[in-house]
Structure formats: C-alpha cells, structure tokens
Amino acid sequence: MSASTMKEVVYWSPKKVADWLLENAMPEYCEPLEHFTGRDLINLTQEDFTKPPLCRVSSDNGQRLLDMIETLKMEHHMEAHKNGHANGHLSIGTDVPAPDGSFSIKVKPNGMPNGYRKEMIKIPMPEPERSQYPMEWGKTFLAFLYALSCFVLTTVMISVVHERVPPKEVQPPLPDTFFDHFNRVQWAFSICEINGMILVGLWLIQWLLLKYKSIISRRFFCIVGTLYLYRCITMYVTTLPVPGMHFNCSPKLFGDWEAQLRRIMKLIAGGGLSITGSHNMCGDYLYSGHTVMLTLTYLFIKEYSPRRLWWYHWICWLLSVVGIFCILLAHDHYTVDVVVAYYITTRLFWWYHTMANQQVLKEASQMNLLARVWWYRPFQYFEKNVQGIVPRSYHWPFPWPVVHLGRQVKYSRLVNDT
C-alpha cells in the first residue's frame, strides 16, 4: 500500500475499507463492516468483537483484524510524522535576535543541547502471525487414507452385492421413464467414462498449479470418501435388478473368497471403469459412482479456478452434463441412480464449503444445526486452522521458469514459487 494512501487512511470511504479487507484476505468482514469508514476502522477495539455482528464472524475474537489495524496505525503514524523530522526527531529550536542584530543564537528547549525535543512514542507491535492457510500435509495424508479406504470398501461391497443380484431372466429390469423415451445407445457409456477421465485429468493439472493444494485436496478427499461411503450403504441395503437385458454379469462365486479377492483387486486396478475391462459385476446401481465423479470434478474445477475463465467452466460443465446424459442413454443406470447421486454430491459439496468458509460454523453451538452432522468432528479437525475463504491463487510448482508466449500481461495470479 502506498504512503500517500496510508496518509489518508482516516478519510477512507467504506468502499476503500472493503478493498483493504479483500487485499488482506479478510473477506468475511466485508459484510459486517460495509458501512465503516477509515476512521471507524482504526477505532475498532477488542470490546467491539464481543458484540454482534462482529462476534459471529471469526473464532479468534477478531485478533487477526486488530493486529492488522495496529500495523495500519503504526504505518499511518510513521507517515504522518515523517515530514519535518530529522532522524526521527522534530527540530523545535528557534532563532532569536542576537545583540548585534543577527539571528545566530538558538533557544534550546528542555535543556537539550541539540535543540531537539525528546518524545516517547509507544507503538504496539503485533506478534508474529502464523500462516492463515497452513498446508498441514499430515492431515491431507489422513484424508487421502480415508478416501482410499472408502474406495476399497466400495469395491468389496460391489463384489458382495453382485452375489445377491437376481438373474435378469427371473427379475427383469424395472420400469424407467427415461428408458421409455430413449432407446439404448451401445457406445454411450464409453463416452461417459472418457468425459470422466478428461475431467479428472483437467482437475489434476489444475490442482498441481494451485498454491494451497494441500487444503483443497484435503477437502476433495474428505468429500469423495464420504460420498463413496454413502454409496456402500445404499448399494447394500437395496439391491436393484439390472437396468437392461444387455447386461452380461460375471458368474457368481458362491463363497469362493479367493476368487472374490482377485476380482476386487482387478476392479481396483482398473479404477472401477468398464472401458478398462475391470468392471463386469452387477448390483452397484443405487447410486451412480460415475455421476459422483462427473459432478464432483466439475464442482471443484469451477470453485477453485478464476471467475474470468468462464469458457473453461462451460467446457467442463458440458463434459459433465454430456457424460451424465450418456449414462442414461446407455441404460447402464436407472434414472433414480443418477438423480440421487447428483443430489447427494452437490449438497455435500455445498454444505462442506459453506461450513469451511464461515468461521462461526466451525464452532459447535445450539444455533449451529450443521454441527449435528456425523462428520462434524473430522471436519473441525481438518479445517480449524484455515482462516477464511481459501484464495484462488496459483503458483508454478516446477523448477524450470515459466515460458511466456506472446504479449506480456500486467498481472497474473500464476507466479514462480521462489
């Protein structure tokens, strides 16, 4: 922030205050302080954060904002007292007429031989601040183990449920409105899986360039793990017949656990995809895992990429929508499988990020009904040290420098990580 701007801090408008809050990564205060001027801002005290609405914004009782305000006051004080000082002291000696009419005699106030006034200024120095967005890779590794465990459990559950699926000759497919209006397209499911792999690849590239990749990947693992855990439950409690007569399910093994283990390992190695030839079991219908990944990757891509890349968002949205439509067009899932998968995925993503972006929702209270979800304690553990909304910041994670092609831009969020 420039010195001229600091000099006028007391004259800041509410808009300038909001800009300062955004520049210092404190967007959560923009709404409660929307009518505050610069003078109101620097007059905030600890007592103000014990009363609404400020008491509901942050769990640190506004300490970070107060520290930033103290720094602001210090910079403002130094700027305001810079001019007219010599080495930090104001010269206040005055010339008085000498007996011969000249002005060579100086009055030395306070008895100081150099004519300077000794002034004591108390400037509170904020304590060294830890990162607002700590990486905490250990927590990320735990979240990864959780997601991996849920994925393995899902493959085990698919193998178990496969043994319970009734033969299509005994129990024909259930009626489905979409199937009544659209004939089956054989190659449609391959398009679905190709779109899914493209979205996962785009998300992986985007993740590599994210500055706060540890926090964001931790959120991804927590959400996708929970979604697959829910899927284990829904698959097990209700076994639906195959959606179409075209299904050729693997033979039942009737308790041969060694063969089942080999089949589970094959499914894990192939990523649970039909296009890799690893998934030829039946019964994993309610709800659709393909819909989960198509929806979740799009949501993360859009949430953690710049808003100006609207064309990128539309491309990813189109890949997701076409992929989901092709699931139904291939008659590989009932419509209810897709609807339930979309609903659960979007709700869990939005709930988790709403709670993560609001400090007050990270504290359990009678007013916070979201604290009653079963995964609230793990959520608190993973998110308690993340202060505020994670910026959509990017960096260059590789040792070689960025190659700029064409004209240079004035500003970019993509910088070298030095």
From Swiss-Prot:
Cellular component annotations (GO), alphabetically ordered: endoplasmic reticulum membrane; Golgi membrane; Golgi trans cisterna; plasma membrane
> Which PROSITE patterns does the protein's record reference?
SAM_DOMAIN
The active site is formed by: 290, 333, 337
| InterPro entries, sorted | SAM, SAM/pointed_sf, Sphingomyelin_synth-like, Sphingomyelin_synth-like_dom
Quickly give the catalysed reaction. Answer: an N-acylsphing-4-enine + a 1,2-diacyl-sn-glycero-3-phosphocholine = a sphingomyelin + a 1,2-diacyl-sn-glycerol; 1-(9Z-octadecenoyl)-2-acyl-sn-3-glycerol + a sphingomyelin = a 1-(9Z-octadecenoyl)-2-acyl-sn-glycero-3-phosphocholine + an N-acylsphing-4-enine; N-hexadecanoylsphinganine + a 1,2-diacyl-sn-glycero-3-phosphocholine = N-hexadecanoyl-sphinganine-1-phosphocholine + a 1,2-diacyl-sn-glycerol; N-hexadecanoyl-(4R)-hydroxysphinganine + a 1,2-diacyl-sn-glycero-3-phosphocholine = N-hexadecanoyl-(4R)-hydroxysphinganine-phosphocholine + a 1,2-diacyl-sn-glycerol
- Tissue and organ distribution: Widely expressed. Highest expression in the cardiovascular system.
According to the entry, every stretch annotated as the SAM domain falls at 12-75
Chain segments annotated as transmembrane:
141-161, 189-209, 220-240, 281-301, 309-329, 335-352
- A biological-process GO annotation: apoptotic process
Just give the chief location class. Answer: Golgi
For this protein, the Enzyme Commission number is 2.7.8.27
Family from the record: Belongs to the sphingomyelin synthase family.
- Identify this protein by name: Phosphatidylcholine:ceramide cholinephosphotransferase 1
**Mind giving the lineage of the organism this protein is from?**
Eukaryota, Metazoa, Chordata, Craniata, Vertebrata
